[in-house]
């Protein structure tokens, strides 16, 4: 159906509080059950980013300035992939702190995907992705804190068109000045491993 291929309507909502400018997306879907499920998960991730700032002692009400935002990376064929960010600073901080998360979902089914769910069972996707990331690290001369040990089972990612972007939190594998190390990997590198009904599989059809 043509309707399924149209972009999903996304509404921006805000969390009102002094010195906080936290904006987050809410999807407007015809299926309200899926809408509620996906939007609840988005809000949970937004709150988790805020909690990380608070847990690390960077949040002081009325003093900490915090900006939360989002970017839509993919919105086609019913597949929505977006990133959520939280930036916090206050006078006693030498450097601002930033946290990043993401979510990828099929709005036609309400399924929210972990990285492993993009691929066929028992495929060696992690090995192939690790090899591709290692090659990019060398080619781009990305500074590391130690030896690259590969992606985790719940590795953060998002999808931009037909490209998979694997990323790491600040200080996970690189010094802070590198920011969030991101590794774009075109789908053709592992097309044989992609599950047909996953977001990447749908975008490739």
Please place each PLM-identified region on the residue numbering.
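Compositionally biased intrinsically disordered regions enriched in Thr/Gly
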Residues: 1-205
């Amino acid at each position: 159906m043509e309707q399924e291929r149209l972009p999903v309507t996304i509404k921006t909502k805000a969390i009102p509080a002094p010195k906080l400018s936290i904006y987050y997306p809410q999807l407007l879907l015809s299926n309200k059950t899926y809408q509620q499920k996906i939007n609840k998960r988005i809000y949970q991730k937004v709150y988790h980013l805020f909690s990380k700032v608070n847990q690390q002692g960077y949040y002081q009400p009325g003093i900490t300035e915090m900006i939360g935002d989002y970017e839509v990376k993919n919105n086609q064929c019913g597949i929505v992939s977006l990133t959520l960010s939280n930036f916090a600073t206050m006078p006693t901080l030498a450097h601002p702190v930033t946290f990043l998360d993401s979510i990828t979902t099929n709005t036609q089914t309400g399924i929210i995907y972990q990285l492993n769910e993009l691929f066929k069972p028992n495929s060696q996707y992690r090995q192939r992705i690790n090899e591709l990331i290692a090659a990019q690290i060398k080619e781009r001369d990305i500074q590391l804190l130690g030896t690259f040990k590969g992606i985790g089972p719940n590795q953060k990612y998002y999808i931009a068109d037909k490209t998979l972007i694997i990323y790491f939190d600040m200080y996970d594998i690189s010094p802070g000045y590198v920011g969030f190390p991101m590794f774009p990997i075109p789908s053709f590198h592992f097309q044989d491993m992609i599950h047909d009904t996953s977001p990447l599989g749908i975008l490739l059809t």
